Amino acid sequence: MTDLKTIIEEAYQNKDNFTTDTVPKKIHQAIHQTIELLDNGELRIAEKQNGQWNTNEWAKMAILLYFKTEPLKTFDAGYTFFYDKIPLKYTNNTSQPQSGVRVVPHAIVRKGAYLAPNTVLMPSYINIGAYVDSGTLIDTWATVGSCAQIGKNVHLSGGAGIGGVLEPLQAHPTIIEDDCFIGARSEIVEGVMVEKGSVISMGVFVGQSTPIYNRQTQEITYGRIPAGSVVIPGSLPSKDGHYNRYSAIIVKQVDEKTRSKVSLNELLREG
């Protein structure tokens, strides 16, 4: 994989020197090999190592090169035709059952996204570079953006959106860690991290500029929701007191033992 990384990095530095028609065969093959590694889960855009998330920038480079070098083409989706650069993930009748993933009609997964066994897709959309781990449910009309990392046993409720982050290359993707619940119509975007075991209420919107207020500590932070947080939508007064600004409010933090004994609705109502 080291050789592949070197080829991709060098190609990205010279990406303006070739087009769909002129891309060298060696680079074309390296791009496709990288996309295949992402597609089968051997390579991830981001990995947690020693408690820290690290981004594989070269894998992002490969995706951007894939967009640049692939021609638009028509392909058959069974009930209709699409015209795009990136094919769908499941292209034959044998690959889907072998994957161990349940895919309800009208769910869309692009090539280069990985779904672990025992995941369930209701009619939803999973973009290239995304990683969805085992036991996770992607509910109706939920979207998982490019390169987003979704942990084990996560529930993305109806209409929830997890934003994609391809550029800048060094930016972390949006990350939802294991055992999280993301409420209906909530949006987690711009590389925000929701740590393990957190519960996000319906209609919570969190980007890098969204204040995250911890009711217990009275601290305001940005870009990260700590493990075990129970979060609801709210607002904070402006500095001049003339208006209120939308905020995500951490009403409490719970451990796994508490969460296992208490329903999600109870946790949110107690806030």
Swiss-Prot record:
User: Pfam families recorded for this chain?
Assistant: Hexapep_2 (PF14602), THDPS_N_2 (PF14805)
Report the record's Gene Ontology biological process terms: diaminopimelate biosynthetic process; lysine biosynthetic process via diaminopimelate
Q: Where is this gene product found?
A: Cytoplasm
State the superkingdom: Bacteria
Q: Is Transferase there in the keyword field?
A: yes
Q: Which reaction does it catalyse?
A: (S)-2,3,4,5-tetrahydrodipicolinate + succinyl-CoA + H2O = (S)-2-succinylamino-6-oxoheptanedioate + CoA
Q: What class of enzyme is it?
A: transferase
MF terms (GO), sorted A to Z: 2,3,4,5-tetrahydropyridine-2,6-dicarboxylate N-succinyltransferase activity
Q: Under which EC number(s) is this enzyme classified?
A: 2.3.1.117
Q: What GO CC terms are in its UniProt record?
A: cytoplasm
Q: Which pathway or pathways does this protein act in?
A: Amino-acid biosynthesis; L-lysine biosynthesis via DAP pathway; LL-2,6-diaminopimelate from (S)-tetrahydrodipicolinate (succinylase route): step 1/3
Q: Which UniProt keywords apply?
A: Acyltransferase, Amino-acid biosynthesis, Cytoplasm, Diaminopimelate biosynthesis, Lysine biosynthesis, Repeat, Transferase
Q: Which family does it belong to?
A: Belongs to the transferase hexapeptide repeat family.
Alphabetized NCBIfam families for the sequence: dapD, PRK11830.1
PANTHER family this protein is in? Answer: 2,3,4,5-TETRAHYDROPYRIDINE-2,6-DICARBOXYLATE N-ACETYLTRANSFERASE, ACETYLTRANSFERASE
Protein name as annotated: 2,3,4,5-tetrahydropyridine-2,6-dicarboxylate N-succinyltransferase
Q: Name its species.
A: Coxiella burnetii (strain CbuG_Q212)
The gene designation is: dapD
